[in-house]
Each structure stands twice: as C-alpha cells, then as structure tokens.
Amino acid sequence: MNNERIYQVLKGPVFSEKAQVLGETAGVQVFKVDINATKLEIKKAVEKLFGVDVLKVNTTITKGKSKRFGKTLGRRSDVKKAYVTLKAGQDVEMADLGDTAESAAE
C-alpha cells in the first residue's frame, strides 16, 4: 500500500466519549475512514502509519441525516468508522500522526 492510499483510507480520529473510554479500557482506537475502505486496507494503513500491531478491525457505517436549509432539502454524507483493536500495551498517540506526515514529505 502506497503512502497516498494510506492518507485516503484514514481520514482522522474520532473524538467522542465512547472512543475515549474504549481507548482507555480496551485498547481500541476509533478512526473515520473512507467509505470504500476494506478492513484489510484499514489494518495495513494503521500498522504502517503508527507502527503498531493491529489485532482486529470492526467497522460501522452511519447513514447521513436529511436536513433542511431554508426551502431546500439537503443530506449529510454517510460516515464510516473503524474500531481498531491494538495489541496489549500498545497505544496510538495522535501527535504521531503529524510527525509521520512531516517525515513522509521529506
């Protein structure tokens, strides 16, 4: 998997109360990912980008809501989230994401 595809697959971390509790108790990190990304692509992207061992990947797709903008009816985009379980004792620091992006550009 090339570096460009890694950054297409992983869109960013999810910051929520549930994600924080899972990260602290079960060693699970939550990421927003590309809607077409497969579990294998997500696993390889996290392992390569953060240098950790991934045990399993669970994904969910949240359908976008219909919203009104004045007279027009719009729709929010669907979002795919990946719950990535890491090997015991390993953790992903979100500061690592910025460091890796800078080193990949060099």
UniProtKB/Swiss-Prot annotation:
GO biological process, one term: translation
TM helices/strands, residue ranges: none
Pfam families: Ribosomal_L23
Protein origin, superkingdom: Bacteria
Secretion signal span: none
GO-annotated molecular function: rRNA binding; structural constituent of ribosome
GO CC aspect terms: ribonucleoprotein complex; ribosome
Keywords from the named record: Ribonucleoprotein, Ribosomal protein, RNA-binding, rRNA-binding
Physiological role: One of the early assembly proteins it binds 23S rRNA. One of the proteins that surrounds the polypeptide exit tunnel on the outside of the ribosome. Forms the main docking site for trigger factor binding to the ribosome.
Family the entry assigns: Belongs to the universal ribosomal protein uL23 family.
Listed name of the protein: Large ribosomal subunit protein uL23
Organism, as annotated: Acinetobacter baylyi (strain ATCC 33305 / BD413 / ADP1)
Gene: rplW
